[in-house]
Curated annotation (Swiss-Prot):
HAMAP family xrefs: PSI_PsaC (MF_01303)
Domain 4Fe-4S ferredoxin-type as annotated: residue spans: 2-31, 39-68
UniProt KW Hydrolase keyword: no
Protein name: Photosystem I iron-sulfur center
The organism of origin for this protein: Mastigocladus laminosus
Lineage of origin: Bacteria, Bacillati, Cyanobacteriota, Cyanophyceae, Nostocales
Quaternary structure and partners: The cyanobacterial PSI reaction center is composed of one copy each of PsaA,B,C,D,E,F,I,J,K,L,M and X, and forms trimeric complexes.
Length: 81
């Protein structure tokens, strides 16, 4: 089952999510929108196992990263009945 990893622009570029990911789904890329000048990116979502360690590791109060598991992806996008 595929999962969707969504990175929000509230990311502070701390790299906690990247270090927490056991399958190297995430990486940091250059971005001018925060003081750290980088933001998390999820180029390999097909490797996501849905453990949500990245969410747990995120130090922001507004969870800059979310993992939507299988059917949850459909619901979150308003595609379910």
């Amino acid at each position: 089952m595929s999962h969707t990893v969504k990175i929000y622009d509230t990311c502070i570029g701390c790299t906690q999510c990247v270090r927490a990911c056991p399958t190297d789904v995430l990486e940091m890329v250059p971005w001018d929108g925060c003081k750290a000048q980088q933001i998390a990116s999820s180029p390999r979502t097909e490797d996501c196992v849905g453990c949500k360690r990245c969410e747990t590791a995120c130090p922001t109060d507004f969870l800059s990263i979310r993992v939507y598991l299988g059917a949850e992806t459909t619901r979150s996008m308003g595609l379910a009945y």
